[in-house]
């Protein structure tokens, strides 16, 4: 039976009790409105820990002024059932006052230079500062041995890895594979914003990522690969924020096409902003 906690002292008592028994504890942070991708992270965490805590907190500091904080989908009953079925042991439900006791305006910010300043960092200024700030607080509250994040948010995972290394958090960071719909669309809590007409078109993002990989692999110049990807998305009806090929650390690759790379796309379809990536 999953335990639901809203009090920080109760959470710490539970986790400390587990640790006194010599058990490893994992954290799966979420913003709720959960889907199969989130539950796969719980199952991944379970492979590396004896107990799994998932948090649901819609974090106001990672939303920009014109973004969807107020209307972000909240589905608490379904989330609880899904987490229990996935094998989660405890659900941590902090409120804003617990997460930001001095208020969000006085919250001590955390910025991960470099990796958080490009791509999503350019499109959504301050977003990753909010992510780092809330994740660091969750780490301090739960004090896990392991934490799992999805690779769909590739840059977010890179930012968190940098923060953990730089601030010496004694936490192993796991990256969970992207879970996709049958047509290739990466599962996302924001997919429900898509209209019935937009939903089939949205799968073009994954198709374009595959084209980017294949084109780059045969030696097509990176700029040409990126331009072709943007054009294909625009022709399908997207407004493109970026379609790029990067090295795993998100720096720009040189002239060589060997080694590991990642293609990343962010684009809007109607009012819905979608992100996806493909490692190769």
Curated annotation (Swiss-Prot):
Beta-alanine binds at residue 62. Disulfide bonds: none annotated. GO terms for biological process: pantothenate biosynthetic process. Pathway: Cofactor biosynthesis; (R)-pantothenate biosynthesis; (R)-pantothenate from (R)-pantoate and beta-alanine: step 1/1. SUPFAM superfamilies: Nucleotidylyl transferase. ATP binds at residues 31-38, 150-153, 179, 187-190. Keywords: ATP-binding, Cytoplasm, Ligase, Nucleotide-binding, Pantothenate biosynthesis. CDD domains: PanC. Its EC number is 6.3.2.1. It is found in: Cytoplasm. Its main location: cytoplasm. It catalyses: (R)-pantoate + beta-alanine + ATP = (R)-pantothenate + AMP + diphosphate + H(+). The reaction proceeds by a bi uni uni bi ping pong mechanism. Belongs to the pantothenate synthetase family. This is Pantothenate synthetase. The gene is panC.
